[in-house]
């Protein structure tokens, strides 16, 4: 099999696919996000448990993904504490394809590059106040370059087709990110990431986050990660810590 390359935990997907005939589970064991107060002083907290991306290798350079989000909870806190609400349930089902144009089998020496494309669609499951109520989708274009034997840079641009808050139409949101990854030892690595989202309908403006984390790979098919994203702009979540697990079979 090829080198173990999970997409998590950063927001930047990589261009590499899972080997044909193999399955990879990438899970958020726990994921928490805390928003900044909006114009009305409302704060939103989100709790995710067991959100899992199932990646299935189809051919040498193609895979299918199914993002399952069974246990999500949202707490909305208003200025009046008595008005605090809780909503809980499954989120949307995301179905994704990934195609590697090149680099799957040649990303070994410094200077090597890889390129892929990742189209996806979000399908509402239940109307419970947690997930979206409309079909949405988009496409990612991930790129990676190997800087040295221990470091690589991953870049991604994404176009999201999002349902308008008002009316029946859709608009395009633009997500871009870059993640610098460094191998500390044969089992431990880390990353630093900058991500932006513009074209969103939030009156506070665009979203900018900085993320970092620590990754532990006890063997060539398992990864445990812990980290957090930190919001820079007013529209960004204030903090987003997480703990995750990836396993390849």
Regions found by a protein language model. Name each.
Residues 1-249:
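Transmembrane beta-barrel domains of Gram-negative outer membranes and organellar outer membranes
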